UniProtKB/Swiss-Prot annotation:
Similarity comment text for this entry: Belongs to the peptidase M24A family. Methionine aminopeptidase eukaryotic type 2 subfamily.
Textual note on the cofactor: Binds 2 divalent metal cations per subunit. Has a high-affinity and a low affinity metal-binding site. The true nature of the physiological cofactor is under debate. The enzyme is active with cobalt, zinc, manganese or divalent iron ions. Most likely, methionine aminopeptidases function as mononuclear Fe(2+)-metalloproteases under physiological conditions, and the catalytically relevant metal-binding site has been assigned to the histidine-containing high-affinity site.
CDD domains: MetAP2
Required cofactor names: Co(2+); Zn(2+); Mn(2+); Fe(2+)
Superkingdom to which the source organism belongs: Eukaryota
Species assigned in the record: Colletotrichum graminicola (strain M1.001 / M2 / FGSC 10212)
Catalysed reactions, as listed in the record: Release of N-terminal amino acids, preferentially methionine, from peptides and arylamides
Annotated localization: Cytoplasm
Binding site for substrate: 214, 323
Official protein name in the record: Methionine aminopeptidase 2-1
């Protein structure tokens, strides 16, 4: 889920000083090991020279009975237990597929260079103090939560890539994704607190063509049907105990747009490769733009250079907060802010054949509690107070959409939502689009900046 650049803000504002020099320019397939019982083999008795030994009539009766007892019937071959596999659509809980509760790690990349901290004479630097507060990133339980969320994302998107075809409505696709996520997590998210334990990290984004980010089908909107010539961005998050995996990909059914998709995929991988401890934001941005703008795409006989989108950014992630505060633009900038050990980033990129600057489109994608919202606020409507209580119990600071309120059985909530937005309790997110007639693409991964390597936790065999 992209972080929108504030209006009129020059990229380079993560709190870092301006640059004084030039910028330097994703589990193995699972099955269960099946065991079989071998046939009991008695073998052949050796011959004996004593002929009397072979004469059955000369044996005592008791010995004959004992001989019968010794004979064993051949064991029946046991049928191998059926290997547990994910269904289509995905509905088998992950706990059934991973009975030990251990989930596959993402791709592990060693840092290109050893981080060199700035020289200072303080006994404990502010960076070290910040890291101490993020030491939990090496906690096995946290890592397993992240890997579980990533495995859910991989299995659900595998179904999307295999099953979704032109003719599907965006509502059917979004519902299929979200039903799959909830089924794999074995949590339908109905009771208070359920959605805080696990569930969607934010509403499923399904953006066609010039629509670039933050669109999801909501109640009252017309059905949008996927066409063969559409370019669809699929962006959704999965969270376990508040740790959000944010990953996105682009689908098209016409090879005309292959280069547009390749540009965003390459730019995202370039950003991931450049990212690391003590790496400056401006250096990651430069690598992203260089990769993105090395591509062009021919559409209906006209060649378009692929541009990096200017006013939406990659971002860090905090617990229960999809946008943590740091931003990584897709264009060169002077931001000297450093990435730090223990941080979590959603490295994403958007490419476009349009202007490269997005505008707010009509409608509302979703809502989220502002992290600095007042704890107590006087609202003019009792319904708004009840709605606020429900949102805090069900979602906390996780972004949600109106479809999610419908699932909970709420109605007549629009006035309450508008009231909460106007009183600074909720933030609303608008769809973002480039000029009509243009096409955009997106790819995204979540990475963990661990002590000795970066883990691309959402990496799969697909991208």
């Amino acid at each position: 889920m992209g972080s929108k650049t504030p209006e009129e803000q020059i990229p380079g504002g993560n709190g870092g000083p301006p640059s004084t020099g030039p910028s330097s320019s994703g589990g193995e397939p699972r099955g269960t090991h099946l065991s079989r019982d071998g046939d009991g083999s008695l073998g052949d008795h050796g011959d004996d020279d004593d002929a009397d030994e072979d004469d059955v009539s000369s044996r005592p009766l008791r010995a004959d009975v004992e001989e019968k007892k010794k004979k064993k019937r051949p064991k029946k071959k046991k049928k191998p237990a059926a290997a547990k596999e994910q269904s289509s659509p995905p509905r088998v809980p992950l706990s059934d597929l991973f009975p030990l509760g251990e989930y596959p790690a993402g791709e592990d990349l060693v840092y290109d260079r050893v981080p060199q901290p700035d020289a200072n004479t303080a006994r404990t630097t502010t960076a070290e103090l910040r890291y101490q507060s993020r030491k939990h990133l090496e906690d096995p339980a946290l890592l397993n939560d992240y890997r579980k969320a990533a495995e859910v994302h991989r299995q659900v998107r595998h179904w999307v890539q295999e099953a979704v075809k032109p003719g599907w409505t965006l509502l059917d696709i979004a519902t299929g994704i979200e039903d799959g996520v909830r089924s794999l997590l074995a949590n339908q998210g109905i009771e208070p607190g359920d959605n805080l334990r696990s569930g969607m990290g934010f509403p499923t984004g399904l953006c066609l063509n010039h629509e670039t980010a933050h669109y999801t089908p909501n109640p009252g909107q017309r059905d949008v049907v996927l066409q063969h010539g559409d370019v669809m961005k699929v962006d959704y998050g999965v969270q376990v105990n508040g740790w959000i995996v944010d990953s996105a990909f682009t689908m098209s059914f016409d090879p005309t747009y292959d280069n547009l998709l390749a540009a965003a995929r390459d730019a995202t991988n370039s950003g991931i490769k450049a990212a690391g401890i003590d790496v400056r934001i401006c250096d990651v941005s430069a690598e992203i733009q260089e990769a993105m703008e090395s591509y062009e795409v021919e559409i209906r006989g006209k060649t378009y250079p692929v541009k990096a989108v200017r006013n939406i950014c990659a971002h860090d992630i905090k617990r229960y907060r999809i946008h943590g505060g740091k931003s990584i633009p897709f264009i060169r900038n002077n931001d000297q802010t450093k990435m730090e050990e223990g941080e979590i980033f959603a490295i994403e990129t958007f490419g476009t054949t349009g202007r490269g600057k997005l505008y707010d489109d009509i409608g509302v994608y979703g809502y989220g509690l502002l992290h600095d919202a007042p704890a107590q606020v006087r609202l003019p409507f009792a319904s708004a107070n009840r709605l606020c209580k429900t949102i805090k119990e069900q979602f906390g600071s996780i972004v949600f959409c109106r479809r999610y309120l419908d699932r909970l059985g709420l109605d007549r909530y629009l006035a309450g939502l508008n009231c909460l937005v106007s009183h600074g309790v909720l933030e609303s997110y608008a769809p973002l689009a480039d000029i009509k007639g243009s096409y955009t693409s997106q790819f995204e991964h979540t990475i963990l900046l661990r002590e000795s390597s970066k883990e691309i936790v959402s990496r799969g065999s697909d991208y």
